[in-house]
Amino acid sequence: MAKIRVYELAKELNISSKELITLLEEEFSVEVKNHMSAIEDEDANLIKELLSGKEKSEKTKEEDDEIETTAKNPIKESMNNKKSNKRDDKNEKVNTENAEDMGIITMTSDTITVKEISDKLEKSYAEVIKELMLMGVMASVNQEINFEMAEKLAAKFDMEILKEDEDEKEDLEDILKDNEEEEYLQKRSPIITVMGHVDHGKTSLLDAIRKSKVTSTEAGGITQHIGAYTVELNGEAITFLDTPGHAAFTAMRARGAQVTDIVILVVAADDGIMPQTQEAISHCKAANVPLIVAINKIDRPGANIDKVKQELTEYGLVAEDWGGDTICVPVSAHTKEGIDDLLEMILLSSEILELKANPNRKAKGTVVEAKLDKGRGPVATLLIQNGTLRVGDSIVVGSTYGRIRAMFNDKGRNIESAGPSTPVEILGLSEVPEAGDKFYQVKEEKTARGIADKRKEKIRDEYLQSTHKVSLEDLYNQIQEGTVKELGLIVKADVQGSVEALKQSLEKLSTEEVKVRVIHGGVGAINETDVTLATASNGIILGFNVRPDNNAIIASERDGVDIKTYRVIYDAIEDIKSAMLGMLEPEFKEVVIGTAEVRQVYKISSVGTIAGAYIQTGKLARNAGARVIRDGIVIFESELASLKRFKDDAKEVAQGYECGLSIEKFNDIKEGDIIECFIMEEIKKKTL
């Protein structure tokens, strides 16, 4: 039997949801939780009949009164009616819009400005301020009023205001839980994750299924980031997630297991079970996800299918033909052998699982991948797990939010809507979300912003912990001294998948002496905000395939924050490991401290060549490095052997003064030569 939501029925009857809920409980003994609850059509029709009867009798009475009054003064009433009709039209428009908002407005904090509540009530600022004055409150447009006052004000305009509590904002699952009854559910496509050890042929297998060459475009044949693809098979769609197979990306693979219905575990027939294969099996068991084993590379000379099945039994996976319940399909991504059998098993398994979703509800799902695109801004790949997502919808994703400006399918085509089990790429988010974040569709962007801001504030509070400054070069000493108990890291990368991979690998480096903690991970260039966070939390910033901007460089030098950038993920891991063991060698750079022009040359037999020079810039210091430059070309590089001011030895001579000097192991100084003095200074390594 069909159902209708309370707010929809209230809109049809032109009454508030609160009034309708009261009516349902008192007149019909129907208990409803809130305006999003659904009631039977039969009850809805009875309510319509009841209220339409009342309205009809009231309307008849009003019309009789109106006829009587009009007869008394027809000309005056005619003019009044014209004005009244205009007002009624205007009010009707407002009421219609209010009905769409279900007669309920919400506050996300303890206070609200007069401007905000005016917009929510769809009343002019003057009307609202006037009502406040009548209530004894003098307030300007930008002044805030508390919840109690806002509640009274809303009642004046026949509206009700609700304050969203923390639980409701944080647990959107409860808000979006309606209409999960069997009658609303429809069959959906299975979501398949392909897992396995590196080089066992995961992407090649997907390539064989999709009949498109993806492997050749990926560096070293390794999938760098999670991709989501939809393929058609016998009129049915199957969505594939491809997770990277390397051990460093365990976090990404685990995230894939949480959104998938069936896992295809790819095992090479000539290699057997490997470390990443074991991890994949663990993730599947932990997530209670069905598993199909694809024994790949059966065309290889050393292929041994029975050996693979034997190894699988050690992990509790017994093949069907060995009396177990694990589906094992021998395949060859190269020759396409067994591909059809594998696809048939996927469809068979999905039928047994009876996968269903409700496409007519608000959308929710998971962020598969996210990145910052130079031309398009924050871009996120979403996997819709329930409901239908449309262009123009407002969503909240972790601590970010947005209104969908554009949506693309896995083939890059622009689409207007997408249903359950569909991967889409969206534009319009305020920031780059975290991979693995849940997304929820909400009524309006303002609601999404309120929820996101609250979450962001909570995260920010967790970050701000102030301790001693740390750098990789002196990390070991600080650990030995006991001043460092926790190494905080801020990780920035070009894509979210890399952030998670680094985070997972770095946190494994924790020891008894020091705990490694990634306090923040994000996508995009290293900015001043990251440096501020590192300053407050005594952290080190690690960049992977990204660079710090100018403001970040200035701020890091000012605050003494260590920034390291890398292009290879394992170099970052090795540097942290070496620093913790006290083996990281510091990096040095040359700093020119001054230049001098040779104006006169003296040759002394017992000493050598002495140059009389004038300091042009900076200063010259004894025992500093020195190079002789003639006509822009470096002639010789050594050290200052001596430095004198008149007849006295000098430690240094400043700009604007003359001095006598000699160069270690060099006597061919000529007038007009430039002596460049420099020192080697230890620096924080900025790049490899």
Swiss-Prot record:
Domain of life, per lineage: Bacteria
Keyword Translocase attributed: no
Chain sites annotated for binding GTP: 196-203, 242-246, 296-299
Subcellular location: Cytoplasm
Region feature (Disordered): 53-100
Basic and acidic residues bias (residue ranges): 53-62, 86-95
Annotated stretches, region: G4: 296-299
G3: annotated span: 242-245
GO MF, one example: translation initiation factor activity
tr-type G domain location: 187-354
Gene Ontology terms: cellular component: cytoplasm
Region annotation G1: where it falls in the sequence: 196-203
Biological processes per GO annotation: tRNA methylation; tRNA wobble uridine modification
Region entry G5, spans: 332-334
Sequence similarity: Belongs to the TRAFAC class translation factor GTPase superfamily. Classic translation factor GTPase family. IF-2 subfamily.
Protein's job: One of the essential components for the initiation of protein synthesis. Protects formylmethionyl-tRNA from spontaneous hydrolysis and promotes its binding to the 30S ribosomal subunits. Also involved in the hydrolysis of GTP during the formation of the 70S ribosomal complex.
Name assigned to this protein: Translation initiation factor IF-2
Annotated organism of origin: Clostridium botulinum (strain Hall / ATCC 3502 / NCTC 13319 / Type A)
Recorded name of the encoding gene: infB
